Amino acid sequence: LHSFTEAVDLGHDIDVPLDYLPDIQAYKKATAVLRVVMAEKFVVNDYLEAAGSFDRLVELPDGRMVMADIKTGKDAARYAVATAAQVAIYANSMLYAVATDTRTAFPDALDTSMGLLIHLPAGKGECHIHKLDLTFGYQFATAAAEVRDWRKTKPATLAWSATA
């Protein structure tokens, strides 16, 4: 389902299996106001030591660009916090070309305070778009990275004696 949304967003003429047709039609309707600027690009966030590929960079009707992540599971609310953190990392990253080890900034119009969760539950024939608070998401991601780093440290060794 995810690969079909990408093909649709890139303007490819594809044959969608009948099982996915209601989902793709719902996706097209829900995302009609969004203009896809980039899809499935690799990014790196050196500060958080994180990397990955975002689903979409989209332009809103007001001209702002925001990161969007597509989820096909049953319950979008179940993973809203983790998705906000994930999308916030992408929005605060640099485009990264692995072959040349080159980092490129996103366009200035990228809004790093808000993102979108595009919820397309597989087999339901419905699609809903939810706003994500990326300021909160980045705070969450930063805290998670700090915990990850703390877990890597070696604890101070304390001498202990049962008689002390």
PLM region descriptions:
Residues 38-160:
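Mg2+/Mn2+-dependent nuclease catalytic core
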Residues 1-51:
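Metal-dependent nuclease catalytic cores that hydrolyze phosphodiester bonds in DNA/RNA
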